Amino acid sequence: MKNRKFWHWIKNDAGESDTADTPTVRTLYLNGVIAAESWLDDDVTPQLFKDELESGTGDIEVWLDSPGGDVMAATQIYNMLKNYKGKVTVKIDSLAASAASVVAMAGDEILMSPLSLMLIHNPLTVAAGNVDDMQKAIDMLDEVKQSIINAYELKTGLSRAKYRI
């Protein structure tokens, strides 16, 4: 079964070669749920995303339309985009919700239409077990919350106190 990725690349101005005056910009469409692992070959891991990201050079435009997903996978993608050598422009097509909002923060520039939405919320999980297990889940969620606030704080320059998620 062929993998169905939640992203795909398009190289702008097909057939045009890179020059110092007109470098080619690659376009990444990141659509759908962000996942850490593929269970049914319908998601792709961050490692495969990294391989494709690093397969080209130059500036990139990321068109983002995602309801979010796994925050740890989103964190990996955020880090890959932040470490990318070219300029990263994030364009929120319609929705950057939940973990996708973390990916958006990796852009050197973030652009949204007046109709686009960004949803930021407290991280969620499913937990089962006794009171000790529940406390561990609460502590883990608190750590995740603080880590994603780091991305928002770094991008906006707003103090942590401004984020009431």
Question: Where are the predicted features?
Answer:
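N-terminal organellar transit peptides
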Residues: 1-99, 106-165
